[in-house]
Amino acid sequence: MPYASLDLDYDKEYKASWVVYPNSNFDPKVGHYLYNTYLDELEMGEELGFDGLCVNEHHQNAYGLMPSPIVPASALARRTSKAKIAVLGNAFGIREHPLTLAEEHAMIDCITGGRLISGMVRGIGAEYYSMGANPAFSHERFHEAHDLVIRAWTDEGPFSFEGKHY
C-alpha cells in the first residue's frame, strides 16, 4: 500500500522515504482514499478468483502504509468469504508483546472460519530503529516471539514462559 501522492522529487529535500520522511507530507484525505481503494482492490481479488489476499507490515515510510496488517486483515475477514487472508509479515520482534498478536491472529482466524495465514517476520533494521528497538537483538527477539506465539496457539491450558525479551 504505497502512498501514491509521494512527491517524486522528495529525494532533493529528504535523505530517504523511510524513518526520516516527515509525516507532514501525509494528507489524511489522500490516505482515506488510498486505504479504501486498496481494500476495494483486495476484495476484488476474491471476486476475480484469487485464492489468497495478502497484507504486510511496514513502519514510518512512504512505500508501505500498513503499520498494522491486522487492521486490513480484519476488514477483509468480514467482507470476503472464500479467499485465504495472508498476513505475510507481522513483525513480531518489534511489537509490545507477541501474545497480543497471537490473540489478534486467532481472533481473525475464528472470524474467517480458518482462512487466516499467519506470516511471522523479523522486520528490518530501519523499522527496529523507528520503533525504538535495538536491531542487534532482532534475531533472538523474533525467535523468542515465534516460539511463544506457537505455544499460545498449540499448548493446552495455561503455561509458563520466561524468555530474555518476553
Which residues are covered by each model-predicted region?
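Structural motif
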Residues: 56, 88, 119-121
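Glycine-rich "substrate-gating" loop/helix at the edge of Rossmann-like oxidoreductase active sites
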Residues: 62-65, 90-96, 135
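Glycine-rich anion/phosphate-binding loops
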Residues: 32-37, 93-107
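Short coil/turn segments at secondary-structure junctions
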Residues: 22-29, 92, 129, 133
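N-terminal beta1-alpha1-beta2 module of alpha/beta enzyme domains
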Residues: 1-86
